[in-house]
Amino acid sequence: MRKSLIFIGLLFFGLFAKAQEMPLMRPIPDHSFAHFERNHLVFPGDNTAMERFFAKMDSVIFLGQGNVSIMHIGGSHVQAGSFTQQFRDNLFSISDELMGGSYFVFPFTAGKTNNPSHFMVSYTGEWEYCRNAVSRPTDKRMGLAGAAVTTTDPEASISIVTRERYPSDLQPEYTFNKVTVLGFSETENVVPVVHCDSVTIPGLYDEWLSTYTFQLPDFTDSVCIGFDSVAGEFTLTGVLLDNGMTGVSVHGVGVNGASVPSYLRCDDFERDLDLIRPDLIIFGIGINDAAEKNFEKETFKQNYGELISIMQRVNPDCALLFMTNNDSFKRIKKKKYEVNPNGKIVQQAFMEMAEDYGAAVWDQFDVMGGLRSMQNWEKAGLAQKDKIHFTRDGYKLIGDLLYNALIESYMQHVRQNAKQ
């Protein structure tokens, strides 16, 4: 692996030193209503944190050493999976040997809601689901995933397969030999186990982290999680897969309807975040905040400040990348919509926060065409009729755009360092 990555590093160096056309960029279709020529990362303030992240990327690409962890966090745009999947697949299309060891997932299918497209889940038994976007007295404690599934069914199980629902030529193969189940039993008599072929594997319990870790006998792309008790209750709040490889890991964390306060309500968020310890956090939260009738920019920034404080306690050196909201509309009556003007306010808020926190901004709002542009995306088959969400093709396109903006900035970093 190391030799292959060093070869990729030399390829990077040669291309950048000669300032040739950048072949690692994804092709972007021409749409006159969009501003794709402005698809760049913007740094309203200091870029030291991003340079630090790029230096870690250098270590992986040029030396074949170390690990880089990227987390993309948001709402339904992230839970759908296609956006993060496209960004992730683009990154690993440079070389599948860039793929790092860890992979955080949540089995949404067991909660009878849509599962991200970049892995598949099946289940047996009865499960109860709760999510951070809806507050109920019966909700269980939640962590990084922003969701939880609970069962009292002794026959319950969850199976996870790391294959994409919509395979593409870019899709890398991911296998693992270590599984960490995040969760707890309030009745204290239910313990998860892993079924691998005909063997039942017990886990190593960490009381502080509330995790059960299972070492598998071989590398695999699938796992079945069951339980060793005939009675009681267990709540699962996430699953971390790992294979011990060096490289880049990309984690998608998204819950339908989630706003910034949604994640602040998750009691175990900070504790769980330390399991993946991101070096780059891509913030895609904001579309649901901006949909509120009494949306206020300063409250939005204050909430984000609390969330960023959590992130920085886990990793003070992590780089932050804010995504401005996509343009969106509100339904005021059946088949009648009006544009949500808060998109411009959120755009300004992110620019201000980026200056305050030394973060980057990917100005999705501007790149897609600005206010009312979602109508054009819908006409082009890239956005859904609700004028909030994208179609699968639309999510793939914004995944390409985000990837291009980040890799362009990284290429500039490499080129500048090549001159030194």
Describe each region flagged by the PLM.
Residues Q79-H195, L204-Q302, H389:
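Conserved SGNH/GDSL esterase-like catalytic core that processes O-acyl groups on lipids
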Residues M1-I28, R415-Q420:
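Bacterial Sec-dependent N-terminal signal peptides
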Residues G74, G183-S185, T324:
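Short beta-strand/turn micro-motifs composed of small residues
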Residues P27-H72, G143-A147:
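Membrane/wall-proximal cationic-aromatic binding patches
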Residues K56, V60, S76, A80, ...:
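Structured segments of extracytoplasmic/periplasmic soluble domains
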Residues D327-Q420:
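Catalytic His-Asp segment of secreted/periplasmic serine-dependent ester chemistry enzymes
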Residues G66-H72, Q79, F83, M245-Y337, ...:
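Conserved, compact domain cores that house catalytic/ligand-binding motifs in diverse enzymes
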